[in-house]
């Protein structure tokens, strides 16, 4: 008996994350990509823009009703913030059974949506068909802070540096290589959306200062944590090892991880664990690829989880 593949479509596929999603879907034995929506690339063959895809599918320019009419089993929205609502409304009205995964910030504060950071939230998944993917910076911050969450004596201070792919493909200062050359560009130094996201998810205030760097992909998150009681470096290291012992995408390392080593890989490295005198302050460093674990890989984990498959299918 032949098992029918699960059909999937992507809305907003021109961006860097869309390209990574196409590669992961092409590698998935149980998924069939049935539409890819992009106004800018409409009419062009997907295979010309994605190394991993070999079919004849072409990009289409689809509005919300047209996406709903495709009746795909799964739809991933890879749109800029603020653009998801019409597509969600159309799918809610016409295909409520569709599994919908939104990569924007639009539904991360909506309690009706499952917030999908599997290493921290998979135990709360209860069959929701609406999944909000966490932000890239927010993923790094939460994974770096959580093992010491109950020991915090004050707000974590998080200094984040991202490659310019995190600024998307729409031209701006933050993804202009000429402006970024020999430069580090701070922005949104208070009240960044990922600061609010992490504060809400962890239930503690978090202070976040993002920066864009000249490299293309990868995030370095340096987190300063004040502790209620002194802990040794060995105790802290052991807490992280224990918390993530069964998480194959999270590697605890001794030295501070380098972003150059994580770019293009699916997981997260956490390390550095440097104590201040008195052992009530520790600095932890996390690195991840913003396009993969910060976006596409995490979406695939959430998809696999929701459909009852091995969480790492197509991820490796």
Swiss-Prot record:
Its Gene Ontology molecular function terms? N-acetyl-gamma-glutamyl-phosphate reductase activity; NAD binding; NADP+ binding
GO-annotated biological processes: L-arginine biosynthetic process
Q: Which GO terms describe its cellular component?
A: cytoplasm
Compartments, record wording: Cytoplasm
Q: Which reaction does it catalyse?
A: N-acetyl-L-glutamate 5-semialdehyde + phosphate + NADP(+) = N-acetyl-L-glutamyl 5-phosphate + NADPH + H(+)
Report the principal subcellular site: cytoplasm
InterPro entries in the record = AGPR_AS, AGPR_type-1, NAD(P)-bd_dom_sf, NAGSA_dehydrogenase, Semialdehyde_DH_NAD-bd
Per the record, the domain of life is Bacteria
In which pathway does this enzyme or protein participate? Amino-acid biosynthesis; L-arginine biosynthesis; N(2)-acetyl-L-ornithine from L-glutamate: step 3/4
Catalytic center at which residues?
136
* SMART domains, per the entry: Semialdhyde_dh (SM00859)
A Pfam short name: Semialdhyde_dh
| E.C. number | 1.2.1.38
Keywords on record: Amino-acid biosynthesis, Arginine biosynthesis, Cytoplasm, NADP, Oxidoreductase
**Similarity section:** Belongs to the NAGSA dehydrogenase family. Type 1 subfamily.
**What's its job?**
Catalyzes the NADPH-dependent reduction of N-acetyl-5-glutamyl phosphate to yield N-acetyl-L-glutamate 5-semialdehyde.
Q: What's the name of the protein?
A: N-acetyl-gamma-glutamyl-phosphate reductase
Q: Which organism is it from?
A: Xanthomonas campestris pv. campestris (strain 8004)
Q: Which gene encodes it?
A: argC
């Amino acid at each position: 008996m032949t098992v029918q593949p699960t059909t999937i479509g992507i809305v907003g596929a021109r961006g860097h994350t869309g390209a990574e999603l196409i590669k992961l879907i092409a590698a998935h034995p149980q998924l069939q990509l049935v539409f890819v929506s992009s106004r800018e690339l409409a009419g062009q063959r997907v295979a010309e823009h994605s190394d991993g895809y070999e079919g004849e599918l072409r990009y289409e320019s689809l509005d919300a009703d047209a996406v709903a009419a495709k009746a795909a089993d799964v739809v991933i929205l890879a749109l800029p913030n603020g653009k998801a609502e019409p597509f969600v409304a159309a799918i809610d009205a016409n295909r409520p059974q569709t599994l919908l995964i939104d990569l924007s910030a639009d539904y991360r504060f909506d309690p009706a949506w499952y917030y999908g950071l599997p290493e921290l939230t998979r135990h709360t998944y209860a069959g929701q068909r609406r999944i909000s993917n966490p932000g890239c910076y927010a993923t790094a911050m939460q994974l770096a802070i959580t093992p010491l969450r109950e020991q915090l004596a004050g707000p974590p201070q998080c200094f984040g540096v991202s490659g310019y792919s995190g600024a998307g493909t729409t031209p701006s200062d933050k993804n202009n290589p000429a402006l970024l050359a020999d430069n580090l560009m701070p922005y949104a130094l208070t009240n960044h959306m990922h600061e609010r996201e992490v504060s809400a998810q962890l239930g503690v205030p978090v202070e976040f200062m993002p920066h864009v760097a000249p490299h293309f992909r990868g995030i370095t998150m340096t987190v300063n944590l004040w502790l209620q009681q002194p802990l040794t470096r060995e105790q802290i290291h052991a807490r992280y090892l224990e918390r993530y012992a069964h998480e194959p995408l999270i590697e605890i390392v001794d030295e501070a991880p380098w972003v150059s080593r994580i770019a293009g890989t699916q997981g997260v490295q956490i390390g550095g664990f440097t104590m201040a005198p008195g052992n009530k302050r520790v600095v932890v460093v996390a690195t991840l690829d913003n396009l993969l674990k910060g976006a596409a890989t995490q979406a695939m984990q959430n998809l696999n989880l929701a459909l009852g498959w091995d969480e790492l299918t197509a991820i490796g």
